[in-house]
Amino acid sequence: MAKRLERDGQPNRSLRIPAERWRFRIRGLVQGVGYRAGCCRRAQELGLAGWVRNCSDGSVEVQAEGDEQRLTELRVWCEGGPPGARVDSVDGSRVATTGADWFEIRPNHFQGGALTR
């Protein structure tokens, strides 16, 4: 991450908020209800980078990168989901940042390497 320097040569930490990357696994009735599209839309509104995809076990996986406040707002959205979804749980963890600068819907991820849309 680029750092801006003050006149004394020290970094000005107030100019850049360090990014974090969070991973969520959402379980419940979350496939076939517009969950990925809604999540992508909300993440883009929040200015987050990352992706969302369906998993073979019926869950949805999200990885999002940005500041902690906006990531928390996305998690709150994930806990409710779009109309028609029934969220039973949202498990989250921090993962390494990637420096991505967009949010996308990724192809479905199924164990064994098979990918579908």
Swiss-Prot record:
It comes from the Bacteria. Its EC number is 3.6.1.7. Disulfide bonds: none annotated. It holds the Pfam family Acylphosphatase. It is an enzyme of class 3 (hydrolase). The active site is at 36, 54. Keywords: Hydrolase. The keyword Translocase does not apply. InterPro entries: Acylphosphatase, Acylphosphatase-like_dom, Acylphosphatase-like_dom_sf, Acylphosphatase_CS. It comes from Synechococcus sp. (strain RCC307). The lineage of its organism: Bacteria, Bacillati, Cyanobacteriota, Cyanophyceae, Synechococcales. It catalyses: an acyl phosphate + H2O = a carboxylate + phosphate + H(+). This is Acylphosphatase. Residues 21-107 form the Acylphosphatase-like domain. Belongs to the acylphosphatase family. The keyword Iron does not apply. One of its GO terms (molecular function) is acylphosphatase activity.
